[in-house]
Amino acid sequence: MHIQNAVKTASKRLHYLTVMARHGLPPEDLVSIYTTLIRPCLEYSSVLMVGCNKKQQAELERVQRRACKIITRRAGNISQPLPSLQSRREEAAVKLVRDMHDQEHPLHDLLPPTRGSRTGRTLRNQHRLADPEPKAKTNRLKNSTLHTAVRLYNEL
């Protein structure tokens, strides 16, 4: 439900981008309008959406593609292409797991121990979590935020 509301809100805000493009704003300004006005709607609580299904990912990416079409319609090409929303969500999830390694982090207890702390020895892969993929009996749990974030962190 949250993703549908985010897509709906961002789609409504695309109108502002269209109006600004019609008035001849340069593409750099249109990109900054997109990143300050529209993308926050799509990325609100994005760490929690890292495990969303393919259909929901496509809905979110569709809004960004529409914004890129509006921006590039006037200029032809953007000097720096916008990163996909999925890659930004994955980066945020990995950052969350890194932050959770801190003993003072409120969610620290949810992480499994690292391989180095479990064995007590210096290992090449000691930064990885001991369980490469947390055990999950259902796909819903397997695609949940924490499980997906741990899986992405271990893939680094």
Short names for language-model regions:
Residues 1-156:
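Hydrophobic/basic alpha-helical segments
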